[in-house]
Amino acid sequence: VKLLLTVFLVLLCGCTHKRSELGTADNPIKFYFVPSVDVRLLEDTSKALKTYLEAHTPWKYKISIPQSYIAIVEAFGTNRADIASLNTYGYIIAHEKYGVEARLMTERFGDRVYQAQFLARSDSGIKKIEDINGKKMAFVDPASISGYLLPLKYLNDHHIKPKETVFAMKHDNVVTMVYQGQVDAGVTFYSPPNEGQIQDARRLVKAQFPDVEQKVKIIGLSSDIPNDPIIFRKDMPEEMKQKICIEMIKFAKTIDGQRVLKQLSSVTGLVPTTDKDYDETRAAVKALGGIK
């Protein structure tokens, strides 16, 4: 009886293990999206990507949109994340702590870099970054390079001290706060115009505020920042990483992929990348004290 029970338990464990293999319905590949823009846009994009990947790879996927960048970083630390579309700073932290790998980079109209932009209302009297001194200012998130870290470094280096600062948590929220006069100035991501249309964060609220280009002006730009990466858990099977990367690049070239990615921070494509492409920014973040 004991022998039969032992054999049964071994077989049961084996079946359970098989059911729990990564990519099965019981253990889908867990794909996280950074909450940098409106959740509805993220849901639209992630749903389309999930549908495409499940049709073009042999695996199942589960999409998650947490409340912060850091939640994604820690999800890698507890093996709750396999892939993530993450901001550059979050990736740098996750790479340092958990060895995640950057395999893909977003591309915007052929550009693989972007910048931070300082914004102010056109009627505010704020004409340059130095005028922010003593004013109320909105940042995006403490883990955002374009929405906090590099702008903060500029302010500190030039001895510019806002009277009050707030975190809006999303780039479009910052633009809205500046537009509505809730703050005097703010910082968000910037990409140059394409075909006569703005591609910076103001574009995200243009449907709601058609005159945002006239009401909210750019008063300064930062140095170049590499575009956000798609990252993978370091011990995820290499076959999976390669296949998923190939299919994601193909997805970005489809009509549906182009539609959902473009509405998401003006992304127009995905290209291969490596951790080395982020070394310069990694060094800058370390200099800022962003990595202990």
Predicted regions and their residues:
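Bacterial signal peptide processing site
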Residues: 16-18
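Pocket-lining segment of extracytoplasmic ligand-binding domains
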Residues: 124, 136-239
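C-terminal motif of bacterial Sec signal peptides marking the signal peptidase cleavage site
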Residues: 11-14
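Acidic, polar ligand-binding/catalytic clefts
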Residues: 74-131
